[in-house]
Amino acid sequence: MTNYPQLNKEIQDNEIKVAMHTNKGDMTFKLFPDIAPKTVENFVTHAKNGYYDGITFHRVINDFMIQGGDPTATGMGGESIYGGSFEDEFSLEAFNLYGALSMANAGPNTNGSQFFVVQMKEVPESMVNQLVDGGWPEPIAKAYADNGGTPWLDQKHTVFGQLIEGEATLEDIANTKVGAQDKPVHDVVIESIDVEDK
């Protein structure tokens, strides 16, 4: 049976728990090293080294996603721990459901340090029907129907984690006032990211 780790909030032995502290509250995620090993290692190493500390969510689109992880706050910056961009790690077990932690990119295999959290609360019914026809697994299509998400990003952005606590913080950030290029008028800052060691 295929495992869809995003469909439950329990942290399994093969998952990593991280707490993201922002100036608008905390968000807790579980990461999937079995599904996206290089992506998770990149994120965890950056988190432990303080790379993300003080970085903002530079692009916020309510009812779509919040994006951060760029030290330049322009959407053009950031690098991976591997010294350049690295390859996508797509899976048929992880999807861009509401609350998914996913890599931002500039096309195939251009992952660096930027990530986003999916915040779209409703997938149109017509699209949900297309998902089942298009080969999306039934439990995932149901999760999209029930909770929302951005299915058109599947197999285009690496999903490597899922929000398990702090939905109110995600919503608060998403509802922040933005100016040009969807940049928040008042900085939304990632103060630190704690990685829970097993």
Swiss-Prot record:
Residues 14-195 form the PPIase cyclophilin-type domain. Disulfide bonds: none annotated. The keyword DNA repair does not apply. Keywords: Isomerase, Rotamase. SUPFAM superfamilies: Cyclophilin-like. Pfam families: Pro_isomerase (PF00160). It catalyses: [protein]-peptidylproline (omega=180) = [protein]-peptidylproline (omega=0). GO terms for molecular function: peptidyl-prolyl cis-trans isomerase activity. Its EC number is 5.2.1.8. PPIases accelerate the folding of proteins. It catalyzes the cis-trans isomerization of proline imidic peptide bonds in oligopeptides. Belongs to the cyclophilin-type PPIase family. This is Putative peptidyl-prolyl cis-trans isomerase. It comes from Staphylococcus haemolyticus (strain JCSC1435).
